[in-house]
Regions:
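Flavin-dependent oxidoreductase catalytic cores
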Residues: 1-176
Length: 176
């Protein structure tokens, strides 16, 4: 498994390994191993909406209980050997969860926040709640990256035009 994440495989390409877990000890152990292998940043996945992932309380399943999420973040940020970035959805059930979630995330020294502006319940349906991303740009103390429904160059140009201050764009399913 370690050979698969060797930095030598990504020579010349800025790569950030992503960890999908709900166990802080596992995150810290894996982050240390990745840091020792040469990575300076690790990404925490709070965005995966897959039913098989969220049923185990991982990915966007962690957004269901802010208290559990806060305890997890307290532990990993206290022991992090390197920078931690986060990819997240804007809530589990409802867009109304976003202000409190953003406030919670803003308590931590996140190196970069990637926002997919849908809830877990929405999966990939409907339109992204871009106003939630705008709120992150306005309120977050760290750089914010947009993710969701970017399929063309025109989509990317429109997003960066409409939301100045966007640190970067993340293209997921739109690339496929």
């Amino acid at each position: 498994e370690q050979a698969a994440v060797s930095p030598a495989l990504n020579a010349g390409i800025p790569a950030v390994p992503q960890i999908l877990t709900k166990n802080a000890e596992h995150f810290i152990h894996t982050a240390r191993a990745l840091h020792e292998a040469g990575y300076d940043e690790i990404n925490l996945n709070l965005g995966c909406p897959s039913g098989t992932v969220t049923a185990k309380g991982k990915g966007s399943g962690m957004l269901r209980d802010p208290g559990v999420l806060a305890a997890f973040l307290d532990e990993i940020f206290a022991a992090a050997p390197c920078a931690i970035s986060v990819k997240t959805r804007i809530g589990y059930d409802s867009v109304e969860e976003w202000p409190a979630l953003l406030a919670l995330l803003s308590r931590y020294p996140i190196s970069e926040l990637t926002v997919h502006p849908r809830t877990r319940r929405e999966l990939y349906g409907g339109s992204p709640h871009k106003e939630a991303f705008a709120q992150a740009l306005k309120c977050a103390p760290f750089p914010c990256v947009y993710n969701g429904d970017l399929r063309t160059k025109a989509d990317c140009a429109a997003l960066t035009r409409d939301y100045p201050g966007t640190a970067a764009l993340m293209i997921g399913r739109g690339l496929v």
